[in-house]
């Protein structure tokens, strides 16, 4: 292991060797190769970054908004120039195929583009006359030092929900990326610095519990953005809120897709395969459950099984591969345990992904479990893997009732050409992001990523106008200016 590179934290514009003696291997999940080692940094290092970020905030928040926006525009241009390199880094450490990685890079770039609109986004509003000689104006100001805690499954897109917008609006930022996918962030830091970002405005501290607790407890940090699992998200929200911080925690999901009798069969199967098994199912917008009307179920499921069995599995860097590995061996074992639990509880395993025939890497193939009921573990829990549960229903109303029983409410989709059915679905389903005749209803950067129920803890969501509100304070100034002496 002597020749394995050890990553460093990025504090005050410099790569700084961690003071910890604990490092974890960063593994290519497709091959098992150790790519580098990431430090499990100490609380003291997080606290140091907070002091630096606070000092940088004092200057950065005073930089004119158009000048801040120009740094973001430069960053966006550099990201475009390095798109392929960034995509390959994502595939190398995360495992998703190159096409998906390129799509993720593009989504990240779009978030930076949105953040570059800070001069417009920072605008307040005013009323010229609220009483005789009295006017009022509403101004936005940055909140201060912001902390971000990002997951492994979208190492570029999710952090780019966070730090570009926060920084464009005048805040400084400390990011804890996932220790499983840290290499991509190294490159983003390099490009952001090249774009002209001053030292200390953006800091990266790798780590685990101590760093997370530091972000949640350090008084310098005023707001925290989190994306990850429900248990951790609950902890982040409760702990951060108890320490008087603004917190947004985007957590788990169990997204349902409804297939009605009039759906275009071929198009629906293609979309469900992509939504359920793309990115190895490791995304909070994955299709986890299909509820299909009985009249079309046999035909639909026969086509779905055939398509699932024909999915090409392998290293995401190889041509033609659709399904890459899950992130770690423990995730692979956990997924297999869920599949076996489903069979034990009475589900019918019609496509079995437990054995892929690949000798290395952490792979689970497309898996379909049918005859699933809402009391089964595989229906209740977020599995976060390429495992799809299927429930037959009599009609749309039953499908909506089934979906609404879930504790999660991130996304939901419907496949139909019936306008009345679409309207019923829109009005009655409990979910924050809906798709009509598409499989993954992830919104663009200028709309909020708006999960409901146990999929989100907080008030203001990520992205869109919500993110502007989250990263800014408002001041309302009421002023009296008498016109005495200027009368005609």
From Swiss-Prot:
Q: Which GO terms describe its biological process?
A: inositol catabolic process; thymine catabolic process; valine catabolic process
* Group of enzyme by EC: oxidoreductase
Q: What are the catalytic residues?
A: 284
* A Pfam family of this chain: Aldedh
E.C. number: 1.2.1.27
Reaction equations catalysed? 3-oxopropanoate + NAD(+) + CoA + H2O = hydrogencarbonate + acetyl-CoA + NADH + H(+); 2-methyl-3-oxopropanoate + NAD(+) + CoA + H2O = propanoyl-CoA + hydrogencarbonate + NADH + H(+)
Residues the entry annotates as binding NAD(+)? 150, 152, 176, 179-180, 229, 251, 382
Top-rank taxon of the source lineage equals: Bacteria
Q: In which pathway does it act?
A: Polyol metabolism; myo-inositol degradation into acetyl-CoA; acetyl-CoA from myo-inositol: step 7/7
Q: Which InterPro entries match?
A: Ald_DH/histidinol_DH, Ald_DH_C, Ald_DH_CS_CYS, Ald_DH_N, Aldehyde_DH_dom, MeMal-semiAld_DH, MSDH_GmP_bac
Residue runs in coiled coils: none
Signal peptide start and end residues: none
Task: Output one GO MF annotation.
Answer: malonate-semialdehyde dehydrogenase (acetylating) activity
Give the family from UniProt. Belongs to the aldehyde dehydrogenase family. IolA subfamily.
Q: What does this protein do?
A: Catalyzes the oxidation of malonate semialdehyde (MSA) and methylmalonate semialdehyde (MMSA) into acetyl-CoA and propanoyl-CoA, respectively. Is involved in a myo-inositol catabolic pathway. Bicarbonate, and not CO2, is the end-product of the enzymatic reaction.
Q: Which HAMAP family match?
A: IolA
Recorded hits in PANTHER family, A to Z, give:
MALONATE-SEMIALDEHYDE DEHYDROGENASE
Please state what the protein is called.
Answer: Malonate-semialdehyde dehydrogenase
Organism expressing this protein natively:
Listeria monocytogenes serotype 4a (strain HCC23)
Gene label: iolA
């Amino acid at each position: 292991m002597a020749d394995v590179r050890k990553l460093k934290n990025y504090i005050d514009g410099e790569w700084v060797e961690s003071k910890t003696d604990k490092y974890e291997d960063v593994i290519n999940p497709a091959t098992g190769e150790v790519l580098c080692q990431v430090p499990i940094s100490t609380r003291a290092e997080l606290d140091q970054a907070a002091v630096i970020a606070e000092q940088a905030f004092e200057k950065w928040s005073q930089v004119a908004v158009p000048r801040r926006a120009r740094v973001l525009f430069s960053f966006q241009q550099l990201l475009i120039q390095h798109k392929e390199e960034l995509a390959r880094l994502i595939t190398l450490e995360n495992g998703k195929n190159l096409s998906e990685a390129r799509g993720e890079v593009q989504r990240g770039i779009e978030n930076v583009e949105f953040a570059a609109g800070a001069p417009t986004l920072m605008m307040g509003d005013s009323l010229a006359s609220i009483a005789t000689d009295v006017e009022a104006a509403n101004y936005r100001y940055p909140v201060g030092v912001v902390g971000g805690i990002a997951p492994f499954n979208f190492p570029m897109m999710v952090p780019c929900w966070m730090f570009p917008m926060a920084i464009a609006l005048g805040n400084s930022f400390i990011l804890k990326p996932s220790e499983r996918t840290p290499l991509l962030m190294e490159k983003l830091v390099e490009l952001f610095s090249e774009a002209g970002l001053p030292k200390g405005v953006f800091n990266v501290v790798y780590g685990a519990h101590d760093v997370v607790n530091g972000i949640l407890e350090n008084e310098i940090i005023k707001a925290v953005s989190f994306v990850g699992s429900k248990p951790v998200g609950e902890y982040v929200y409760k702990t951060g809120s108890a320490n008087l911080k603004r917190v947004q925690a985007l957590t788990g999901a169990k997204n349902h897709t409804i297939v009605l009798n009039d759906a275009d069969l071929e198009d629906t199967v293609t979309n469900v395969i992509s939504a359920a098994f793309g990115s190895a199912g490791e995304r909070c917008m994955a299709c986890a459950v299909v509820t299909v009307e009985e009249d079309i179920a046999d035909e639909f499921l026969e086509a779905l099984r055939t398509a699932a069995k024909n999915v090409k599995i392998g290293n995401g860097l190889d041509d033609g591969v659709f399904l890459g590995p899950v992130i770690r061996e423990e995730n692979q074992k956990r997924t297999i345990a869920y599949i076996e639990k489903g069979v034990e509880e009475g589900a019918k395993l019609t496509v079995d992904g437990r054995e892929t025939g690949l000798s290395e890497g952490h792979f689970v193939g497309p898996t379909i479990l049918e005859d699933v009921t809402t009391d089964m573990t595989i229906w209740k829990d977020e599995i976060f893997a390429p495992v799809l549960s299927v429930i037959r229903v009599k009609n749309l109303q039953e499908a909506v009732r089934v979906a609404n029983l879930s504790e999660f409410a991130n996304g939901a989709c419907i496949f139909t050409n019936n306008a009345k059915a679409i309207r019923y679905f829109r009005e009655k389903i409990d979910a924050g992001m809906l798709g009509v005749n598409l499989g993954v209803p992830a919104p663009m950067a200028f709309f909020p990523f708006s999960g409901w129920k146990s999929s989100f803890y907080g008030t203001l969501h990520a992205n869109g106008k919500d993110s502007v509100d989250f990263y800014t304070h408002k001041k309302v100034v009421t002023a009296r200016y008498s016109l005495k002496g200027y009368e005609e």
